[in-house]
Amino acid sequence: MSTTSTFLTRKPVDNLLEMGAYEHLWQQPSTTTKRIAELFESHPDQLPSDLVDLSAAHESAREVIEHFAGRGIKNFGIRLNGTADYPGRLRDAKEPIELLYFLGSWELAEAPRRVAVVGTRQVSAEGAARTRRLVKELIKHDFTVVSGLAQGVDTIAHQTAIEAGGRTIAVIGTPISEVYPKENASLQRQIASQYLVVSQVPVLRYKNQTPKWNRLFFPERNKTMSALTEATIIVEASETSGTLIQAKAALDQGRKLFILESNFSNTAITWPAKYEKLGAIRVREFDDILRNLE
């Protein structure tokens, strides 16, 4: 990884030190994404290393690197809020992520026309077919397809983008060293080596706490995925789907939110009409997407 970057208002910074400091902050009791965001909002000109003991930061950095090495990861990168190479779009999030890990080609995160394709893990046969048709059209029109590497719609979106010769980004809810679901191990490796995998999840916190608490990182990544893209397209989702967290985030962040027409025809759910009233765009044909993203 690159060991230095430039802080917008300060001298060059040590990325490994900042990574360790950030990880150390996350190991404090009761730390949450919201509390981390509030901490840096109240210290806008400070780096993670300004807020912790430096010996603790170095120790945490060593632990992360050792953990990654044990998982076969050597060439990873980070992006730190406040540096020139941090994605400006992520600052639109209600609680901007202070540090991101990534594997692969970061240039994809800056490519034009990034669109998230998301939906249920228990996708129907019709929903799977709609996902494939949608992604093929997006790739045909030179969009970069972003999704969360979950089962169902996400997996199909990534696979179809690759098969169609397009670009894809996975924004995952685990550290870059972990795979969830396990069935996607090969797909995650392929995206990491040929495209881009992004994670906001603190490595040591995830390693040291139980799955019950680690599940809370998944909805947070949906907010980041929305901020990183110019639009979110929902293929299929239930009334309680985590996809709706991303739907709300998209509207809050000033992003376009598209909902496929088939969702409005499903009498078992009411969320499509609710979000249409809030500003979401109903998609009856692919041109509805193109017209609104010109």
Language model segments and positions:
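Short, small/acidic-rich helices and loops at N termini and domain boundaries
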Residues: 1-84
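Glycine-biased, small-residue-rich flexible motifs in mid-sequence functional cores and linkers
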Residues: 2-18, 76, 81-294
